Design a protein with these regions (language model features):
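Short alpha-helical segment that forms part of, or immediately flanks, the ligand-binding pocket
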Residues: 140, 163-168
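Acidic donor-binding loop of glycosyltransferase active sites
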Residues: 144-158
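Glycosyltransferase donor-sugar binding loop
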Residues: 82, 95, 108-122
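Conserved donor-binding/catalytic core segment of Leloir-type glycosyltransferases
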Residues: 34, 71-89, 95-99
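Short beta-strand->alpha-helix junction loop in the catalytic core
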Residues: 10-11, 39-40, 57-70, 117
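A short, active-site helix/loop in glycosyltransferases that binds the activated sugar's phosphate group
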Residues: 17, 23, 29-56
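Nucleotide-activated donor-binding/catalytic signature segment of Leloir-type glycosyltransferases, i.e.
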Residues: 114, 118-141, 148
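Active-site proximal beta-strand in glycosyltransferases
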Residues: 1-13, 34
Length: 168
């Protein structure tokens, strides 16, 4: 049976691929290892023998999305944050900043989509609407009327899908 592995995070920070020996084992066991960026692939190859660098098993498929012409007339004065509501994703930065922004800009609103059971970061404002988890279709509908999408991850995110989806 073929085994295909897809990395969309930093391989050196993930259990099962932190050590050189673990990554060599993955190369031996997998038919293909797909990365979402050259950066992710290069991180995977860190300290590996030169023989692995040119392996045909390793390929990069960059993130993509169907794009449509954006109708700016349908955009509203909405600032949106989508993702895990934790410090790693920068929700604490967004939360404290959005309160100031909303206080200074009375005609703007903010929407937060996501959840996080481990961290309880709470921000309250009468024009801050925290929706919790939403399915992908609902998120895309909200992005279509959003003027500003905020992605403020703290960690080395190879390529966050949220930024791609909000731009398409």
């Amino acid at each position: 049976a073929k085994k295909i592995l897809y990395f969309h995070n930093d391989p050196l920070s993930m259990n099962g691929s932190k050590l050189v020996s673990e990554r060599e084992e993955l190369l031996n066991k997998c038919s293909k290892i797909i990365f979402n960026s050259e950066w992710s692939k290069n991180r995977f190859l860190t300290k590996l023998n030169e023989i692995f660098v040119k392996s045909p098993k390793l390929i990069v498929i960059k993130q993509s999305a169907d794009t449509q012409k954006v109708d700016l007339k349908k955009k509203k004065k909405i600032i949106t944050f989508v993702g895990k509501l934790n410090r790693a994703k920068g929700y604490d930065i967004f939360g404290s900043s959005i309160i100031e922004i909303l206080n200074d800009n009375k005609d703007w609103n903010a929407i937060v989509i996501g959840d996080e059971e481990r961290e309880k970061l709470q921000f309250n404002h009468n024009r801050l609407n925290i929706l919790g988890f939403k399915n992908h279709e609902d998120v895309i509908k909200i992005f279509k009327k959003t003027s500003i999408s905020v992605v403020c991850s703290r960690w080395e995110e190879p390529f966050g899908r949220t930024s791609l989806e909000s731009a398409s």
